[in-house]
Amino acid sequence: MDYALERGVNFWDTAEMYSVPSAPETQGSTERIIGSWFKQSGRREDVILATKITGLSRMTYVRDADVSWTRHTKDQVDEAVHKSLQRLQTDYIDLYQLHWPDRAAPTFGSKMRAKDYTYAYEPFEEILAHLQSHIEAGRIRHIGVSNETAFGVMRFLAESNARGLPRMASIQNAYNLVNRTFEDGGLEEVCVHEKVSLLAYSPLGQGYLTGKYRNGALPDGSRKKLFERLG
Protein backbone atom coordinates (compact mmCIF):
# COMPACT_ATOMS: atom_id res chain seq x y z
CA MET A 1 0.00 0.00 0.00
CA ASP A 2 2.92 2.32 0.65
CA TYR A 3 4.30 1.29 -2.74
CA ALA A 4 0.97 2.07 -4.42
CA LEU A 5 0.70 5.54 -2.92
CA GLU A 6 4.29 6.34 -3.80
CA ARG A 7 3.37 5.70 -7.43
CA GLY A 8 0.14 7.67 -7.43
CA VAL A 9 -2.34 4.84 -6.91
CA ASN A 10 -4.69 6.42 -4.38
CA PHE A 11 -8.10 4.92 -5.24
CA TRP A 12 -8.55 1.72 -3.24
CA ASP A 13 -11.56 -0.51 -3.68
CA THR A 14 -12.63 -3.34 -1.41
CA ALA A 15 -15.86 -5.02 -0.23
CA GLU A 16 -17.35 -6.47 2.93
CA MET A 17 -17.27 -10.00 1.44
CA TYR A 18 -13.58 -9.88 0.40
CA SER A 19 -11.20 -11.69 0.24
CA VAL A 20 -12.15 -13.84 -2.74
CA PRO A 21 -13.12 -16.64 -2.92
CA SER A 22 -15.36 -15.58 -0.06
CA ALA A 23 -15.64 -17.80 3.01
CA PRO A 24 -16.84 -17.24 6.59
CA GLU A 25 -13.31 -17.47 7.99
CA THR A 26 -11.86 -14.85 5.60
CA GLN A 27 -14.85 -12.53 5.13
CA GLY A 28 -13.87 -8.93 5.87
CA SER A 29 -10.14 -9.67 5.85
CA THR A 30 -9.33 -7.21 3.07
CA GLU A 31 -11.04 -4.37 4.92
CA ARG A 32 -9.18 -5.32 8.10
CA ILE A 33 -5.82 -5.25 6.29
CA ILE A 34 -6.54 -1.78 4.91
CA GLY A 35 -7.78 -0.62 8.31
CA SER A 36 -4.60 -1.81 10.01
CA TRP A 37 -2.55 0.09 7.45
CA PHE A 38 -4.57 3.27 8.05
CA LYS A 39 -3.97 2.98 11.79
CA GLN A 40 -0.24 2.35 11.42
CA SER A 41 0.43 4.90 8.69
CA GLY A 42 -1.97 7.68 9.62
CA ARG A 43 -2.53 8.28 5.89
CA ARG A 44 -6.30 7.85 5.60
CA GLU A 45 -6.67 11.31 4.04
CA ASP A 46 -4.32 10.33 1.20
CA VAL A 47 -6.67 7.59 -0.02
CA ILE A 48 -9.99 7.66 -1.88
CA LEU A 49 -11.62 4.66 -0.22
CA ALA A 50 -14.37 2.56 -1.78
CA THR A 51 -16.12 -0.50 -0.41
CA LYS A 52 -19.26 -2.48 -1.18
CA ILE A 53 -22.28 -4.11 0.45
CA THR A 54 -23.18 -7.66 -0.62
CA GLY A 55 -26.18 -8.02 -2.93
CA LEU A 56 -28.88 -10.68 -3.03
CA SER A 57 -27.23 -13.93 -1.94
CA ARG A 58 -27.09 -16.78 0.56
CA MET A 59 -23.79 -15.51 2.01
CA THR A 60 -25.53 -14.77 5.29
CA TYR A 61 -22.28 -15.17 7.22
CA VAL A 62 -21.54 -11.53 6.39
CA ARG A 63 -24.35 -10.56 8.80
CA ASP A 64 -24.53 -10.83 12.57
CA ALA A 65 -28.31 -10.74 12.34
CA ASP A 66 -30.19 -13.97 11.61
CA VAL A 67 -31.23 -13.51 7.98
CA SER A 68 -32.16 -15.92 5.19
CA TRP A 69 -30.74 -13.76 2.40
CA THR A 70 -28.36 -10.85 2.19
CA ARG A 71 -30.43 -7.90 1.00
CA HIS A 72 -30.28 -4.10 0.88
CA THR A 73 -32.83 -3.60 3.65
CA LYS A 74 -32.42 -0.77 6.14
CA ASP A 75 -31.21 -3.07 8.92
CA GLN A 76 -28.69 -4.82 6.68
CA VAL A 77 -27.40 -1.57 5.16
CA ASP A 78 -26.98 -0.12 8.65
CA GLU A 79 -25.08 -3.18 9.86
CA ALA A 80 -22.91 -3.39 6.75
CA VAL A 81 -21.89 0.28 6.87
CA HIS A 82 -21.01 0.21 10.56
CA LYS A 83 -19.06 -3.05 10.33
CA SER A 84 -17.09 -1.85 7.30
CA LEU A 85 -16.20 1.36 9.13
CA GLN A 86 -14.99 -0.67 12.12
CA ARG A 87 -12.86 -3.00 10.02
CA LEU A 88 -11.45 -0.13 7.97
CA GLN A 89 -10.72 1.88 11.14
CA THR A 90 -12.13 5.05 9.64
CA ASP A 91 -15.16 7.23 10.24
CA TYR A 92 -16.13 7.70 6.60
CA ILE A 93 -16.16 5.89 3.25
CA ASP A 94 -15.63 7.95 0.11
CA LEU A 95 -17.61 5.68 -2.24
CA TYR A 96 -20.10 3.10 -0.98
CA GLN A 97 -21.28 0.67 -3.65
CA LEU A 98 -23.98 -1.97 -4.05
CA HIS A 99 -21.81 -4.97 -4.98
CA TRP A 100 -24.52 -6.50 -7.15
CA PRO A 101 -28.30 -6.02 -7.39
CA ASP A 102 -30.75 -6.90 -4.65
CA ARG A 103 -33.01 -8.51 -7.21
CA ALA A 104 -33.06 -11.30 -9.77
CA ALA A 105 -30.88 -9.91 -12.57
CA PRO A 106 -28.57 -11.24 -15.32
CA THR A 107 -25.33 -10.65 -13.41
CA PHE A 108 -21.99 -12.50 -13.65
CA GLY A 109 -22.95 -13.99 -17.02
CA SER A 110 -26.14 -15.66 -15.79
CA LYS A 111 -28.89 -16.47 -18.26
CA MET A 112 -32.39 -15.34 -17.31
CA ARG A 113 -35.84 -16.40 -18.43
CA ALA A 114 -38.86 -14.12 -18.11
CA LYS A 115 -40.17 -15.89 -15.01
CA ASP A 116 -36.77 -15.66 -13.29
CA TYR A 117 -37.11 -11.91 -12.90
CA THR A 118 -40.13 -12.21 -10.62
CA TYR A 119 -38.75 -14.03 -7.57
CA ALA A 120 -36.86 -11.09 -6.08
CA TYR A 121 -37.13 -7.38 -6.76
CA GLU A 122 -35.56 -4.39 -5.04
CA PRO A 123 -37.37 -1.22 -3.95
CA PHE A 124 -34.98 1.25 -5.55
CA GLU A 125 -36.30 4.31 -3.72
CA GLU A 126 -36.05 2.58 -0.32
CA ILE A 127 -32.43 1.56 -0.91
CA LEU A 128 -31.53 5.14 -1.85
CA ALA A 129 -33.26 6.39 1.30
CA HIS A 130 -31.24 3.95 3.44
CA LEU A 131 -28.03 5.20 1.86
CA GLN A 132 -29.10 8.82 2.21
CA SER A 133 -29.28 8.46 5.99
CA HIS A 134 -25.61 7.47 6.08
CA ILE A 135 -24.62 10.29 3.74
CA GLU A 136 -26.39 12.77 6.01
CA ALA A 137 -24.60 11.28 9.02
CA GLY A 138 -21.24 11.70 7.27
CA ARG A 139 -20.44 7.98 7.17
CA ILE A 140 -20.42 7.77 3.38
CA ARG A 141 -19.81 10.55 0.86
CA HIS A 142 -20.86 9.13 -2.51
CA ILE A 143 -22.72 6.05 -3.71
CA GLY A 144 -22.40 3.75 -6.70
CA VAL A 145 -23.50 0.45 -8.18
CA SER A 146 -21.56 -2.59 -9.34
CA ASN A 147 -22.37 -5.52 -11.64
CA GLU A 148 -25.48 -3.59 -12.60
CA THR A 149 -27.57 -3.46 -15.77
CA ALA A 150 -28.83 -0.52 -17.81
CA PHE A 151 -32.28 -1.10 -16.31
CA GLY A 152 -30.95 -0.93 -12.76
CA VAL A 153 -28.91 2.22 -13.34
CA MET A 154 -31.86 4.03 -14.93
CA ARG A 155 -34.25 2.99 -12.15
CA PHE A 156 -31.91 4.35 -9.48
CA LEU A 157 -31.44 7.59 -11.43
CA ALA A 158 -35.18 7.96 -11.98
CA GLU A 159 -35.86 7.63 -8.25
CA SER A 160 -33.07 10.08 -7.45
CA ASN A 161 -34.48 12.65 -9.84
CA ALA A 162 -38.10 12.19 -8.80
CA ARG A 163 -37.57 12.15 -5.03
CA GLY A 164 -34.46 14.25 -4.48
CA LEU A 165 -32.50 11.23 -3.27
CA PRO A 166 -28.73 10.70 -3.63
CA ARG A 167 -27.53 9.96 -7.14
CA MET A 168 -25.39 7.01 -8.19
CA ALA A 169 -22.01 8.47 -9.12
CA SER A 170 -20.36 5.38 -10.56
CA ILE A 171 -20.75 1.84 -11.82
CA GLN A 172 -18.12 -0.86 -11.33
CA ASN A 173 -18.53 -3.52 -14.01
CA ALA A 174 -16.21 -5.87 -15.86
CA TYR A 175 -14.71 -4.43 -19.04
CA ASN A 176 -11.86 -5.73 -21.19
CA LEU A 177 -11.00 -6.76 -24.74
CA VAL A 178 -13.16 -9.89 -24.59
CA ASN A 179 -15.93 -8.68 -22.27
CA ARG A 180 -17.67 -5.76 -23.96
CA THR A 181 -21.08 -6.06 -22.29
CA PHE A 182 -20.73 -2.51 -20.96
CA GLU A 183 -20.76 -1.30 -24.58
CA ASP A 184 -23.19 -3.84 -26.00
CA GLY A 185 -25.87 -3.94 -23.30
CA GLY A 186 -26.92 -0.30 -23.23
CA LEU A 187 -24.85 0.72 -20.23
CA GLU A 188 -22.41 2.86 -22.19
CA GLU A 189 -25.22 5.01 -23.59
CA VAL A 190 -26.86 5.40 -20.19
CA CYS A 191 -23.64 6.30 -18.42
CA VAL A 192 -22.46 8.80 -21.04
CA HIS A 193 -25.74 10.71 -21.04
CA GLU A 194 -26.32 10.46 -17.29
CA LYS A 195 -22.67 11.11 -16.31
CA VAL A 196 -22.23 7.90 -14.33
CA SER A 197 -18.52 7.04 -14.28
CA LEU A 198 -17.29 3.54 -15.14
CA LEU A 199 -14.85 1.85 -12.77
CA ALA A 200 -13.73 -1.05 -14.94
CA TYR A 201 -12.68 -4.26 -13.21
CA SER A 202 -11.05 -7.38 -14.67
CA PRO A 203 -9.13 -5.42 -17.35
CA LEU A 204 -6.97 -8.51 -18.00
CA GLY A 205 -9.87 -10.96 -18.08
CA GLN A 206 -8.85 -12.82 -14.89
CA GLY A 207 -5.34 -13.06 -16.31
CA TYR A 208 -6.26 -14.70 -19.62
CA LEU A 209 -5.29 -11.62 -21.63
CA THR A 210 -1.73 -11.78 -20.29
CA GLY A 211 -1.16 -14.93 -22.34
CA LYS A 212 0.00 -16.97 -19.37
CA TYR A 213 -2.69 -19.63 -19.90
CA ARG A 214 -1.97 -20.00 -23.62
CA ASN A 215 -1.99 -23.56 -25.00
CA GLY A 216 -3.36 -24.92 -21.74
CA ALA A 217 -0.53 -23.63 -19.55
CA LEU A 218 -1.28 -23.48 -15.82
CA PRO A 219 1.58 -21.62 -14.09
CA ASP A 220 2.29 -22.23 -10.42
CA GLY A 221 0.87 -19.45 -8.28
CA SER A 222 -1.57 -18.32 -10.96
CA ARG A 223 -5.16 -17.52 -10.07
CA LYS A 224 -6.53 -20.43 -12.09
CA LYS A 225 -4.11 -22.87 -10.44
CA LEU A 226 -4.97 -21.68 -6.93
CA PHE A 227 -8.72 -21.20 -7.41
CA GLU A 228 -9.98 -23.22 -10.35
CA ARG A 229 -13.54 -21.91 -10.21
CA LEU A 230 -12.28 -18.33 -10.58
CA GLY A 231 -10.25 -19.10 -13.68
Identify the function of each model-found stretch.
Residues 85-111:
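Active-site groove signature of glycoside hydrolases
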Residues 4, 12, 34, 49, ...:
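Conserved, mostly hydrophobic/aromatic
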Residues 21-25, 57-71, 104-113:
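Surface-exposed, active-site-proximal loop segments in enzymatic domains
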Residues 101-231:
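Beta/alpha (TIM)-barrel catalytic core signal, keyed to glycine-rich beta->alpha loops juxtaposed to Asp/Glu
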Residues 1-53, 78, 91, 130, ...:
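N-terminal binding-site loop/beta-alpha segment at the start of enzyme catalytic domains
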Residues 44-47, 91-95, 141-142, 166-169:
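Short acidic capping loops at alpha-helix termini that bridge into adjacent secondary structure
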Residues 1-5, 70-87, 124-129, 153-158:
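Short, acidic/polar
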